[in-house]
């Protein structure tokens, strides 16, 4: 076309291209998670009961985080998108706590370095999926509110009472 894209259309295309990149990265991290599971299976390794319980909580959170980001993107719903960042922050806090607990188990001989390496890979990939979900949700909010300052948005969001409330709700739901 001789007329090209309007500014609004260019913003939409840019948002969609960024989201495609985030979805691709999520797929890459999903493959990494699959590789970790395959390694556990092939080497007949098992986490301790407590580590399995922690991974189960993390998996539940990861599913909710992915579903919230995907639903907000599919429906272009900024309200739904606002639920993603508290979930992502919960992911960060949970992975940090699981790492601390793992180090204590390692120090006390309850876990091996090999299992710890796999657990660390799981945690890193889960965190990165959370980051990409956050990017997707922020893009939905930016599109609806016609703003493009995602860092400023995330900074102001974390000072918001609703964010704090949702974060506390999440922390009581995803208990290690």
Which ranges hold each PLM region?
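Cytosolic, long alpha-helical scaffolding segments
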Residues: 1-176
């Amino acid at each position: 076309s001789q007329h090209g894209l309007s500014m609004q259309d260019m913003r939409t295309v840019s948002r969609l291209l960024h989201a495609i990149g985030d979805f691709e990265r999520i797929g890459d991290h999903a493959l990494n998670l699959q590789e970790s599971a395959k390694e556990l299976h092939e080497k007949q390794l098992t986490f301790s009961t407590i580590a399995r319980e922690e991974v189960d909580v993390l998996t539940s959170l990861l599913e909710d985080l992915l579903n919230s980001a995907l639903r907000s993107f599919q429906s272009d719903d900024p309200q739904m998108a606002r639920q993603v960042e508290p979930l992502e922050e919960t992911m960060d806090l949970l992975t940090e706590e699981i790492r601390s607990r793992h180090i204590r188990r390692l120090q006390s001989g309850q876990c091996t370095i090999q299992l710890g390496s796999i657990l660390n890979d799981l945690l890193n990939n889960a965190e990165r999926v959370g980051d990409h979900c956050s990017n997707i949700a922020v893009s939905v909010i930016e599109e609806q509110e016609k703003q493009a300052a995602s860092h400023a948005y995330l900074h102001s969001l974390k000072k918001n009472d609703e964010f704090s409330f949702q974060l506390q709700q999440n922390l009581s739901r995803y208990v290690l």
